[in-house]
Amino acid sequence: MDIALFSPSSLFSEEDDVSSNGEEKEETQQSFVERKHEFPGMELTIREFSFHQLNANLLWPGTFAFVEWLVEHRSWIEGRRCLELGSGTGALAIFLRKLFHLEITTSDYADQEIEDNIAHNCRENGITPALPHVKHTWGDSFPIAEPDWDLVIASDILLYVKQYPNLIKTLSFLLKSYKSKDDGAVPQTKKEETAMCIGLPKPAFLMSWRRRIGKEDESLFFSGCEDAGLDVKHMGSRVYCIKLRETTKNNI
Protein backbone atom coordinates (compact mmCIF):
# COMPACT_ATOMS: atom_id res chain seq x y z
CA MET A 1 0.00 0.00 0.00
CA ASP A 2 1.39 3.38 -1.00
CA ILE A 3 2.03 6.02 1.64
CA ALA A 4 -0.23 9.06 1.42
CA LEU A 5 1.53 12.36 0.84
CA PHE A 6 -0.11 15.40 2.38
CA SER A 7 0.43 18.75 3.99
CA PRO A 8 -0.96 18.73 7.55
CA SER A 9 -0.73 22.53 7.76
CA SER A 10 -3.32 22.86 5.02
CA LEU A 11 -5.92 20.67 6.67
CA PHE A 12 -9.31 22.17 7.48
CA SER A 13 -8.32 25.68 6.45
CA GLU A 14 -8.13 27.77 3.30
CA GLU A 15 -4.69 28.37 1.86
CA ASP A 16 -3.61 31.80 0.69
CA ASP A 17 -3.51 32.38 -3.06
CA VAL A 18 -0.21 34.22 -2.73
CA SER A 19 3.07 32.80 -1.44
CA SER A 20 5.21 34.47 1.22
CA ASN A 21 7.34 36.24 -1.40
CA GLY A 22 4.30 37.71 -3.14
CA GLU A 23 4.29 35.38 -6.13
CA GLU A 24 1.05 33.72 -7.16
CA LYS A 25 0.97 29.97 -6.68
CA GLU A 26 0.44 27.85 -9.75
CA GLU A 27 -2.57 25.57 -9.64
CA THR A 28 -1.76 21.96 -10.38
CA GLN A 29 -4.13 19.70 -12.24
CA GLN A 30 -5.37 16.83 -10.10
CA SER A 31 -4.18 13.39 -11.18
CA PHE A 32 -5.65 10.02 -10.28
CA VAL A 33 -4.82 6.36 -10.27
CA GLU A 34 -7.37 3.55 -10.42
CA ARG A 35 -6.75 0.41 -8.39
CA LYS A 36 -8.67 -2.82 -7.98
CA HIS A 37 -9.20 -3.85 -4.36
CA GLU A 38 -10.40 -7.19 -3.06
CA PHE A 39 -13.26 -6.99 -0.56
CA PRO A 40 -15.21 -9.92 0.89
CA GLY A 41 -17.32 -11.29 -1.95
CA MET A 42 -16.39 -8.66 -4.51
CA GLU A 43 -13.72 -6.65 -6.25
CA LEU A 44 -14.05 -2.86 -6.32
CA THR A 45 -12.37 -0.47 -8.72
CA ILE A 46 -11.47 2.66 -6.77
CA ARG A 47 -10.06 5.84 -8.24
CA GLU A 48 -7.64 7.43 -5.80
CA PHE A 49 -5.97 10.83 -5.88
CA SER A 50 -2.25 10.71 -6.57
CA PHE A 51 -2.11 13.50 -4.00
CA HIS A 52 -4.73 15.39 -2.00
CA GLN A 53 -4.02 18.12 0.53
CA LEU A 54 -6.87 16.91 2.78
CA ASN A 55 -5.46 13.38 2.99
CA ALA A 56 -8.45 11.89 1.16
CA ASN A 57 -6.29 10.35 -1.52
CA LEU A 58 -5.78 6.70 -0.63
CA LEU A 59 -7.70 3.70 0.61
CA TRP A 60 -6.07 2.92 3.96
CA PRO A 61 -5.31 -0.65 5.13
CA GLY A 62 -7.47 -0.20 8.23
CA THR A 63 -10.55 -0.09 6.02
CA PHE A 64 -10.09 -3.75 5.08
CA ALA A 65 -9.79 -4.83 8.71
CA PHE A 66 -12.97 -2.89 9.53
CA VAL A 67 -14.75 -4.54 6.62
CA GLU A 68 -13.89 -7.99 7.97
CA TRP A 69 -15.33 -7.03 11.36
CA LEU A 70 -18.50 -5.61 9.80
CA VAL A 71 -19.07 -8.77 7.75
CA GLU A 72 -18.67 -10.87 10.89
CA HIS A 73 -21.24 -8.69 12.69
CA ARG A 74 -23.49 -7.96 9.73
CA SER A 75 -26.70 -8.54 11.71
CA TRP A 76 -25.79 -5.51 13.84
CA ILE A 77 -25.78 -3.11 10.89
CA GLU A 78 -28.26 -4.53 8.41
CA GLY A 79 -31.32 -2.32 8.13
CA ARG A 80 -29.61 0.69 9.70
CA ARG A 81 -29.60 4.21 8.24
CA CYS A 82 -25.92 5.03 8.08
CA LEU A 83 -23.66 8.07 7.73
CA GLU A 84 -19.94 7.66 7.12
CA LEU A 85 -17.60 10.39 8.37
CA GLY A 86 -14.32 10.93 6.54
CA SER A 87 -15.41 8.89 3.52
CA GLY A 88 -12.33 9.74 1.44
CA THR A 89 -12.65 7.63 -1.72
CA GLY A 90 -16.05 6.27 -0.68
CA ALA A 91 -14.86 2.66 -0.87
CA LEU A 92 -16.25 1.56 2.51
CA ALA A 93 -19.67 3.05 1.84
CA ILE A 94 -19.77 1.53 -1.64
CA PHE A 95 -18.94 -1.90 -0.25
CA LEU A 96 -21.63 -1.68 2.45
CA ARG A 97 -24.19 -0.53 -0.09
CA LYS A 98 -23.42 -3.38 -2.48
CA LEU A 99 -23.13 -6.20 0.05
CA PHE A 100 -25.72 -5.22 2.66
CA HIS A 101 -27.92 -2.90 0.53
CA LEU A 102 -27.34 -0.46 3.35
CA GLU A 103 -28.97 2.96 3.19
CA ILE A 104 -25.78 4.98 3.54
CA THR A 105 -24.67 8.58 3.06
CA THR A 106 -21.05 9.62 2.56
CA SER A 107 -19.52 12.68 4.17
CA ASP A 108 -16.22 14.51 4.12
CA TYR A 109 -14.62 17.94 4.24
CA ALA A 110 -16.36 20.54 2.04
CA ASP A 111 -14.21 19.86 -1.01
CA GLN A 112 -15.77 19.39 -4.44
CA GLU A 113 -12.99 17.10 -5.68
CA ILE A 114 -13.71 14.63 -2.88
CA GLU A 115 -17.45 14.59 -3.61
CA ASP A 116 -16.88 14.22 -7.36
CA ASN A 117 -14.43 11.36 -6.84
CA ILE A 118 -16.83 9.48 -4.56
CA ALA A 119 -19.55 9.89 -7.21
CA HIS A 120 -17.14 8.59 -9.86
CA ASN A 121 -16.32 5.53 -7.75
CA CYS A 122 -20.01 4.87 -7.18
CA ARG A 123 -20.68 4.85 -10.93
CA GLU A 124 -17.57 2.76 -11.61
CA ASN A 125 -18.91 0.08 -9.27
CA GLY A 126 -22.49 0.04 -10.51
CA ILE A 127 -24.13 2.37 -7.99
CA THR A 128 -26.35 4.85 -9.83
CA PRO A 129 -27.37 7.37 -8.83
CA ALA A 130 -24.35 7.99 -6.62
CA LEU A 131 -24.72 7.69 -2.86
CA PRO A 132 -25.99 10.86 -1.17
CA HIS A 133 -23.18 13.03 0.13
CA VAL A 134 -22.92 15.65 2.88
CA LYS A 135 -20.17 18.27 2.83
CA HIS A 136 -19.20 18.94 6.41
CA THR A 137 -16.13 20.24 8.20
CA TRP A 138 -15.94 18.82 11.72
CA GLY A 139 -16.89 21.35 14.35
CA ASP A 140 -18.91 23.55 11.97
CA SER A 141 -22.70 23.71 12.07
CA PHE A 142 -24.08 20.52 10.57
CA PRO A 143 -26.13 21.24 7.41
CA ILE A 144 -29.02 19.01 8.56
CA ALA A 145 -30.82 20.18 11.70
CA GLU A 146 -32.44 16.84 12.59
CA PRO A 147 -30.17 14.00 11.45
CA ASP A 148 -31.96 10.66 11.14
CA TRP A 149 -28.95 8.36 10.78
CA ASP A 150 -29.08 5.78 13.56
CA LEU A 151 -25.53 4.58 12.83
CA VAL A 152 -22.49 6.75 12.14
CA ILE A 153 -19.32 4.95 11.02
CA ALA A 154 -15.72 5.88 10.33
CA SER A 155 -12.39 4.20 9.70
CA ASP A 156 -8.95 5.59 10.63
CA ILE A 157 -9.95 9.22 11.20
CA LEU A 158 -7.96 9.99 14.38
CA LEU A 159 -4.83 11.15 12.59
CA TYR A 160 -4.81 14.82 13.64
CA VAL A 161 -4.99 15.42 17.37
CA LYS A 162 -5.86 19.09 16.94
CA GLN A 163 -9.09 18.05 15.21
CA TYR A 164 -10.34 15.82 18.06
CA PRO A 165 -12.45 18.58 19.71
CA ASN A 166 -14.08 19.36 16.37
CA LEU A 167 -14.77 15.70 15.65
CA ILE A 168 -16.28 15.24 19.13
CA LYS A 169 -18.46 18.32 18.59
CA THR A 170 -19.81 16.84 15.35
CA LEU A 171 -20.35 13.42 16.95
CA SER A 172 -22.16 14.92 19.92
CA PHE A 173 -24.50 16.78 17.60
CA LEU A 174 -25.26 13.71 15.47
CA LEU A 175 -26.00 11.54 18.51
CA LYS A 176 -27.85 14.12 20.60
CA SER A 177 -29.91 15.56 17.72
CA TYR A 178 -30.83 12.20 16.20
CA LYS A 179 -34.49 11.99 15.26
CA SER A 180 -35.76 8.63 14.06
CA LYS A 181 -37.27 8.60 10.59
CA ASP A 182 -39.67 5.91 11.83
CA ASP A 183 -41.13 7.68 14.86
CA GLY A 184 -44.56 6.45 13.85
CA ALA A 185 -43.48 2.85 13.33
CA VAL A 186 -44.76 -0.14 15.27
CA PRO A 187 -42.86 -0.56 18.58
CA GLN A 188 -40.05 -3.10 18.65
CA THR A 189 -40.82 -6.63 19.72
CA LYS A 190 -39.08 -8.15 22.74
CA LYS A 191 -36.90 -10.15 20.36
CA GLU A 192 -35.83 -6.99 18.54
CA GLU A 193 -35.14 -5.21 21.82
CA THR A 194 -32.96 -8.10 23.00
CA ALA A 195 -31.02 -8.08 19.74
CA MET A 196 -30.45 -4.34 20.14
CA CYS A 197 -29.02 -4.84 23.63
CA ILE A 198 -26.40 -7.31 22.44
CA GLY A 199 -25.76 -5.41 19.21
CA LEU A 200 -25.52 -1.67 18.66
CA PRO A 201 -27.72 0.99 20.26
CA LYS A 202 -29.60 3.61 18.28
CA PRO A 203 -28.03 5.99 17.60
CA ALA A 204 -24.39 4.93 17.78
CA PHE A 205 -20.99 5.78 16.36
CA LEU A 206 -18.94 2.78 15.23
CA MET A 207 -15.29 3.46 14.58
CA SER A 208 -12.31 1.36 13.57
CA TRP A 209 -8.87 2.70 14.45
CA ARG A 210 -5.85 0.86 13.06
CA ARG A 211 -3.18 3.49 12.54
CA ARG A 212 -0.78 3.57 15.46
CA ILE A 213 -0.34 6.83 17.34
CA GLY A 214 0.93 7.56 20.81
CA LYS A 215 -1.19 6.22 23.66
CA GLU A 216 -1.47 9.70 25.13
CA ASP A 217 -2.78 11.14 21.87
CA GLU A 218 -5.21 8.26 21.43
CA SER A 219 -6.55 8.66 24.95
CA LEU A 220 -7.23 12.35 24.31
CA PHE A 221 -10.02 11.44 21.91
CA PHE A 222 -11.67 8.87 24.16
CA SER A 223 -11.40 11.02 27.28
CA GLY A 224 -12.80 13.92 25.27
CA CYS A 225 -15.80 11.77 24.34
CA GLU A 226 -16.35 10.89 28.00
CA ASP A 227 -16.18 14.57 28.97
CA ALA A 228 -18.81 15.32 26.31
CA GLY A 229 -21.27 12.87 27.85
CA LEU A 230 -20.51 9.95 25.55
CA ASP A 231 -19.74 6.36 26.54
CA VAL A 232 -16.97 4.45 24.76
CA LYS A 233 -16.91 0.66 24.48
CA HIS A 234 -14.18 -1.41 22.85
CA MET A 235 -15.88 -4.06 20.71
CA GLY A 236 -12.67 -5.96 19.95
CA SER A 237 -10.24 -5.78 17.01
CA ARG A 238 -9.78 -2.05 17.67
CA VAL A 239 -13.41 -1.31 16.83
CA TYR A 240 -15.14 1.10 19.20
CA CYS A 241 -18.81 1.87 19.81
CA ILE A 242 -19.59 5.36 21.11
CA LYS A 243 -23.06 6.27 22.31
CA LEU A 244 -24.87 8.80 24.45
CA ARG A 245 -24.52 8.26 28.17
CA GLU A 246 -27.91 7.44 29.70
CA THR A 247 -27.91 10.53 31.92
CA THR A 248 -27.15 12.65 28.86
CA LYS A 249 -30.05 11.05 26.98
CA ASN A 250 -32.47 11.80 29.77
CA ASN A 251 -31.48 15.46 29.81
CA ILE A 252 -32.05 16.05 26.09
Stretches with model-predicted labels:
Residues M1-I252:
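S-adenosylmethionine-dependent methyltransferases
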